[in-house]
């Protein structure tokens, strides 16, 4: 059993972005390729959770397994994706990543996993005053809590965190760069992120 594993939530077509964000171009590759490069350098095993409408396209770009949500919970948002990844890879801890944060660094996963300890169910960063539950780490034991929530048709990450013993970590306390957590949700944000990158 791996001690640590990674789960990338690739989703599917994005209505706000106009195309699958996972496959958006970034620094000569794609969002998903960049994220996986950073994750796989820090974690033993990584799996991508993808919507069926883009699964085959994602598989062409990556060298890790690409799976869909467990059929019974398909389309139930991030909780369904996380629990599907937990079922696919057996590990103690899982680092989660959305597919729309292409600035992330392998350093983040090292920092995150250094913060884990058995007394906690989750380690969640607070960046610029906001909780970031999709850039977090979750212990294997959280799986049963997620199933219970999905059975009750509860889908929010906040509902999961309210049931967990969470260690909240302020980004500035662990030398985390706030740029690592920038989400790209629209084409305007995409253009801005590319400009910011070229100005560095």
Swiss-Prot record:
It is an enzyme of class 2 (transferase). This is Probable molybdenum cofactor guanylyltransferase. It comes from the Bacteria. One of its GO terms (molecular function) is GTP binding. It catalyses: Mo-molybdopterin + GTP + H(+) = Mo-molybdopterin guanine dinucleotide + diphosphate. The gene is mobA. GTP binds at residues 9-11, 21, 69, 100. Belongs to the MobA family.
